[in-house]
Amino acid sequence: MSNILIIKHGSLGDLTQAIGAIEDIKKSNLKSHIALLTSSHYFELMNGCPYIDKVLIDKRLPRWNLFYLYKLKKKLISYNFTHVFDLQNSSRTKFYSKYLLNLPKWSSTETTLEPGQLKSDFDKEPVLKRMQIQLKKSGIKTEHVKKSNLNWAVTNIRHITKSYFTKKYILIFPFCSPKLASKKWSYYSILISQLKARYNNKYDIVLAPGPSEINEAKEFNAHVILDRGKALNLNQLFGLIKDASFIIANDTGPAHICAHMNKPGLVLFGSHTSAYKVSIESEKFKSISVKDLSFLKTEIVMEEVKKVLN
């Protein structure tokens, strides 16, 4: 039995998008032991993933921390990996391929490029298309790469939500990383007022903040869902998304979860990137794209909501 390593760091959205690829790798290597190298934030979630046999943590400390790199190298070598699938394709993982695990069977963007093809050109393709090409070049049958199965990650949290509301609900994610303020739409408070005016008898308005977003969430006129005063864990978040009637979000991790669950909803895009490039749309989860989010009116969003909820 061979040991295979998959590397995926990055954000929640990045990891969510990779789960379909991870499933394809596992199903093409059923007799192999599959390990995932990822961030500590995702240990609990991915420890329950049926396509992963072992979750390894990478603290991603600075590369001048030679003691940490030595320990990580020693740990990785101890597993006798025969193949590596680098789904992160970052400068860090390129460094790992040279100095930590110099294996001949290392699948990455660079090993995927056609002769003469530039990585900068390849990176213009949608992320899931790139991932599919990478897996195919490595001999993996790609049946799930473009649609991650997330059912295994869902935890039923109705015992939590019933203390907040009893109706169906519209779930809103008005947050984003402070480093990516250009992704943030500024008019959610107005939108919530308009949603309440139109749907108050049928739908509650719900927010699910992360640990650093709780105080901000309380500024909105909506139910802020917490578990004993703390942010929901990732499995609980998946459960909340699964039961939502409609979802409106910035371009963040939860939006990618919504897309792969094919939930009815909208994701709002400015000029920071495109819905096409990040592969975020599905049959029911659609995008509204504008050059400048500050000019996106709530009336436009409401018109799209009404197409589904009316």
Regions found by a protein language model. Name each.
Residues 1-12, 172:
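Nucleotide-activated donor-dependent transferases that construct or modify glycoconjugates
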Residues 108-109, 227-228, 256-310:
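Nucleotide-sugar donor-binding patch of glycosyltransferase catalytic domains
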Residues 7-19, 45, 177-186:
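A short, glycine/small-residue-rich beta-strand->loop->alpha-helix junction that serves as a flexible
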Residues 33-66, 110, 222-227:
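Conserved nucleotide-sugar phosphate-binding/catalytic loop shared by glycosyltransferases and other
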Residues 12-27, 41-44, 191:
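Short amphipathic alpha-helix
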Residues 149-216:
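Active-site donor-nucleotide binding/catalytic segment of nucleotide-sugar enzymes
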Residues 56-151, 166-178, 272-275, 281, ...:
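Conserved nucleotide-diphosphate donor binding/catalytic pocket of glycan-assembly enzymes
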Residues 189-266, 270:
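Donor-binding and catalytic core of enzymes assembling or modifying cell-surface/extracellular glycoconjugates
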